[in-house]
């Protein structure tokens, strides 16, 4: 019985480790040229943004991010990534929503803990999904 328990524990640990290794972060996504191109265009056309937001364009940028989450709107599955300023996540953060294959990206950003600003002209449904993901 003891061997069975040990074997089960080892299997669970291996599965958890494999699952964590398969999670995709923004740093992984932007290695795909389509994602990087969409994100670069979004930030370039957004006007004046805090300097930390440019860090999301780097595969080893100085920001904090979490693994991808998904939202389906109108039958389309979007990828959601959040990123925040290192050491100040509560006040400076953004949520990014990528269309399939990185074809386009929209975002919501909060600067200095103030109101949300949407980038890329997301639809009302996309804004709702961005806001919901941001508040999690």
Regions found by a protein language model. Name each.
Residues 46-106:
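Mature extracytoplasmic domains of secretory-pathway proteins
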Residues 15-20:
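Sec/Tat signal peptide C-region and signal peptidase I cleavage site
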Residues 6-14:
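Bacterial N-terminal signal peptides
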Residues 21-47, 111-136:
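C-terminal partner/receptor-binding element of secreted or periplasmic proteins
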Residues 8, 27, 37, 65, ...:
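Intrinsically disordered, low-complexity regions enriched in small/polar residues
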